């Protein structure tokens, strides 16, 4: 429980620190979001390397996504992804109905615009993990009602 609280506090301070140290132009053109996503990317690479060192090779892309949704998500956020959908053409949607990094925020509509800065790190986390498993991807997040969110993973074919 204590490690969970520390992760939430660290994440909030990280977001706050990036936005406080930014100049006005950086906030407006999305550089803060990019910084947070790049931090998540590096952390995701490191975590996946550590989590998969003793596991067998994955058969395919779907197996990798299942690993992300079950094992990886459980280790980082203490629960599995609630729903994984795919069109079997390289697009996956991961839905978390009670995303831990958004549960501390109020559920009002006025807070939806601020949700993106709290999701950027996680988008990078997913992208970094997939990158270390040999999958190049684009990860975006969407929130329609707090604290539920959807992460869309678009696999880029080489």
Swiss-Prot record:
Domain of life: Eukaryota
Keywords for this protein: Disease variant, Endoplasmic reticulum, Epilepsy, Golgi apparatus, Intellectual disability, Neurogenesis
Primary location class: Golgi
Tissue expression from the record: Both isoforms are expressed ubiquitously (at transcript level), isoform 1 being the most predominant. Expressed in the fetal brain and different regions of the adult brain and spinal cord.
Alphabetized Pfam families for the sequence: TRAPP
Location of the protein in the cell: Golgi apparatus, cis-Golgi network; Endoplasmic reticulum
One of the GO BP terms on file: vesicle tethering
GO cellular component, one term: TRAPP complex
Entry keyword annotation includes Ligase: no
InterPro entries: NO_sig/Golgi_transp_ligand-bd, TRAPP_component, TRAPPC6/Trs33
Keyword Endoplasmic reticulum: yes
Complexes and interactors: Homodimer. Part of a TRAPP complex. Heterodimer with TRAPPC3. The heterodimer TRAPPC6B-TRAPPC3 interacts with TRAPPC1 likely providing a core for TRAPP complex formation.
Biological role: Component of a transport protein particle (TRAPP) complex that may function in specific stages of inter-organelle traffic. Specifically involved in the early development of neural circuitry, likely by controlling the frequency and amplitude of intracellular calcium transients implicated in the regulation of neuron differentiation and survival.
Family: Belongs to the TRAPP small subunits family. BET3 subfamily.
Disease: Neurodevelopmental disorder with microcephaly, epilepsy, and brain atrophy: An autosomal recessive neurodevelopmental disorder characterized by microcephaly, global developmental delay, hypotonia, intellectual disability, autistic features such as poor social interaction, language impairment and repetitive automatism behaviors, and generalized tonic-clonic seizures. Brain imaging shows cortical atrophy, thin corpus callosum, and cerebellar and brainstem atrophy.
Protein name: Trafficking protein particle complex subunit 6B
